[in-house]
Amino acid sequence: MKTIYQNITLLASFLLLFTSCGCEDEKIEKQPVNYTVLLDLSDRILVPQQLDKDFALIETTFKSFEKQARQNLVISSKDRFSIKIIPQKNSPLNVNHYEDLLQLYLDETEVAIKNKSLVSLSKTLPKILENLKKEALYGSTSNTYFGVDIWAYLHDNGMGLSKSGYENKIIILTDGYFDFESQAHVIQDKNQYTSTRFLNDLTTSNWKLISESQQYGLLPIQLDKNTKWIVAGISGKKSTDILQTEKITYFWEKWLKQSGVKRIGIILNSSKTDMSSKLSEQL
């Protein structure tokens, strides 16, 4: 009888331990998500419908953020959403104004107004983007727009875009070029540069073999290894080079990997619907 009692006690202990472990697993909280969209407003936006595509991707990202925030109670959400406009020389655009309007950090928002703030940005987002489009299109020719320094921006701010304790997702809306008006602005270390001008030297079908043997590429920087980076809108500028999109994709992936990134997504420039669908799958 004593043995039976001991066996029952032992079995009950195992069941209690198993149940406790299950409860602990359920208590493990999923990390909040930090969504950041980087916007390149260089002369690429003169391409018809380009900003419409960019803004569709921004709205897709916001919907993912909103869904994430509402998975549990909004009042307990710590998720973050923001748009960062890459600085551009001589641009009359009030960057700080739009960045303030296009961000919502629920971890820094008072509990009482979290839901109101989320609903408000959801309603006003299309209008804000419409106004941004009007002000961003301040010129009609490429000469009016200076190139944006993506390399310098990410060199200075890349690590700061990722927040500790979060699942970080950074989306860069760009054609993929690191172009400037003057080569004097470019830093070079052997065959690694801070611009993509070296693409002009890789014009043959064996460009990849040449780039690997001579170590062509972009100068690596330091980026958070756990952050997911998505580059959306990559597009070739030269109709005479049918391999240009492939080259840009190759060097972006190479650069991000050399900079420490493990998770990379690439979305080529296509229709608004197609790009939005692909982004939604990767978020």
Task: Indicate residue ranges for each PLM-predicted region.
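Scaffold/interface architecture of coatomer-like assemblies
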Residues: 85, 114-122, 180, 187-188, ...
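Sec-dependent bacterial lipoprotein signal peptides
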Residues: 1-21
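Von Willebrand factor
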Residues: 31-104, 108-165, 169-171
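Bacterial signal peptide processing site
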Residues: 22-26
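Flexible, glycine-rich surface segments
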Residues: 146-227
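Von Willebrand factor type A / integrin I
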Residues: 197-283
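Extracytoplasmic/secreted cell-surface and envelope-processing proteins
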Residues: 45-49, 91-94, 179-183, 238-243, ...
